[in-house]
Swiss-Prot record, chain A:
This protein is considered an atypical serine/threonine kinase, because it lacks the conventional structural elements necessary for the substrate recognition as well as a lysine residue that in all other serine/threonine kinases participates in the catalytic event. BUD32 has protein kinase activity in vitro, but in the context of the EKC/KEOPS complex, the catalytic subunit KAE1 switches the activity of BUD32 from kinase into ATPase. One of its GO terms (molecular function) is protein serine/threonine kinase activity. The keyword Transferase applies. This is EKC/KEOPS complex subunit bud32. Its EC number is 3.6.-.-, 2.7.11.1. Residues 19-272 form the Protein kinase domain. It comes from Aspergillus oryzae (strain ATCC 42149 / RIB 40).
From Swiss-Prot, chain B:
It comes from Aspergillus oryzae (strain ATCC 42149 / RIB 40) (Yellow koji mold). A divalent metal cation binds at residues 114, 118, 135, 317. One of its GO terms (biological process) is positive regulation of transcription by RNA polymerase II. Component of the EKC/KEOPS complex that is required for the formation of a threonylcarbamoyl group on adenosine at position 37 (t(6)A37) in tRNAs that read codons beginning with adenine. The complex is probably involved in the transfer of the threonylcarbamoyl moiety of threonylcarbamoyl-AMP (TC-AMP) to the N6 group of A37. Kae1 likely plays a direct catalytic role in this reaction, but requires other protein(s) of the complex to fulfill this activity. The EKC/KEOPS complex also promotes both telomere uncapping and telomere elongation. This is tRNA N6-adenosine threonylcarbamoyltransferase. The lineage of its organism: Eukaryota, Fungi, Dikarya, Ascomycota, Pezizomycotina.
Amino acid sequence: MSQDPYTPPPLPKPFTNTTPPPTLLTQGAEAHLYKTIHLNTNTPAALKIRPSKPYRHPILDRRLTRQRILQEARCLVKLVREGVNVPAVLALDWEGQGGENGNGGAWLLMEWIEGLVVRVVFERWEAFIKASGGSLGEKELRREEEKVRGLMRGIGGVVGGLHKAGVIHGDLTTSNLILRTGDVDIKDGESPAMVGDVVLIDFGLAGQSSSEEDRAVDLYVLERAFGSTHPQAEKFFEEVLEGYKDSYKGAAVTLKRLQDVRMRGRKRSMIG
Amino acid sequence: MIAIGLEGSANKLGVGIMLHPDNGNPPQVLANIRHTYVSPPGEGFLPKDTARHHRAWVVKLVKKALKEAHVSVQDVDCICFTKGPGMGAPLQSVAVAARMLSLLWGKELVGVNHCVGHIEMGRLITGSTNPVVLYVSGGNTQVIAYSSQRYRIFGETLDIAVGNCLDRFARTLHISNDPAPGYNIEQLAKKGKQLVDLPYTVKGMDCSFSGILAAVDGLATTYGLGGEGKDDETDTPIPDADGNGKPTRADLCFSLQETIFSMLVETTERAMAHVGSKEVLIVGGVGCNERLQEMMGIMARDRGGSVHATDERFCIDNGIMIAQAGLLAYSTGFRTPLKDSTCTQRFRTDDVFVKWRD
């Protein structure tokens, strides 16, 4: 087994000349996310590259990459037009022929969202509650809870706006939500601020759909994500649904469907 | 400890004898024999015919296995059988045989999950410790990762299994079922060059194959490639201006493989990224396919990992894997009392409590 350190594939063309060079933030199964700049050095931007997959037949690979990056960009453009908080699309190349060897990968350049990932906000909050060890007075405790409720409503609000625009996210977790705030550098042991707009990111699995089933599954995925990553905050999930109701008129039908989705057991047993 | 494993969840009847030495030496395969029920071209295997085949052969195979392994009945500790999942009638006939042996010889029974059998045998043969497992066969398609005493299913097929998709397309083309329809498709696909457009259906971590089968069947009909009496020589492609002509049977097999295997590699890669594993283990009958192994190898290499696969002795359904998984469970004290020695068509991989791993 080779133990070579992983080297990301070469950057596609205009980005080979960027100074400073884009910095790799995360590597998923599908895409690499870089932080780079747009037009001038003061405007940061997020660059998502979908490298070509050498295991796939080249025709199939090009077809899938093109389909997916366009799908993502179309969803984002539509949502920006509808006024939903998502990063704006700045540029994209679905052919990905710009690399040194002609296959650097299709890319999508997006507006940079400054802020904290909601997962981190909740993690810090849970750490803060744990560290305070019940020393908080009733009034402070209520204030803390009120903050969480507010953020939860904000999350519900943005998800409602998304569904109102006819888009399904497909992978709603707290890692794909950013709290746009100036207050990024909070010291450990302090309760994080929870004010600011909630912005949805990563539309890699998104699609346009008007079925209530898809919307209900979207909410269910989010609910499960809270259950598994933020057990402390899970009890306020009702607030997400409240925020959702406020921002989306068709919420009643979706929430009714959500009941059914929750009641469904595990997937049916699979044979032949 | 010595265990006999009986497997008959589909058209293969397998008997294996496994030895786990008491001094902690590596386990030894004492015997691993198989007899396959092969149906004529254009047909699948029906449960009743398959069950009849298993009933007719099981005693012969057990006798032969004992002889090959040079063990006597006294040496055997337990009798392991496939409890499920699989086809009802074949499972039943093998379960009856296992019960009969248990009563006749006074040995304990151990009911084994077929999927867990595949995983444990793959781990034993390849020595890979904690891989993401892709289990692909005629009846199952699952991406599995181990976590706290369960083999958890990360993604799976939403309808038919990948092997079923290949087998049924072999039926459409009237390709021989001997030694296996999937093997013959693989050989034919090596001659294919032109990639035809087929649906690509990955939904999150799950895959769907029935629509692809319908699409490729439709193409075979459109181009008159289905049915009897066609072979590869009779249809030569006539390329048009773009170099794309009427696809051949080989092209369809090639395109089908490329499409469905890409889907499998994609979901496996997602599971690897999610659990942070660098090893992949491919098990199940379709796991013999060298193109699938190759594609998985390229993906794993790009992630700085490696792929493990076994050959047809252990990939295709066999008795030894049932003995292996059964013996692991037996050594932790697991027993299947006679009254519970039933079998079931539906038995989820994550229903099994894996007591023998940390």
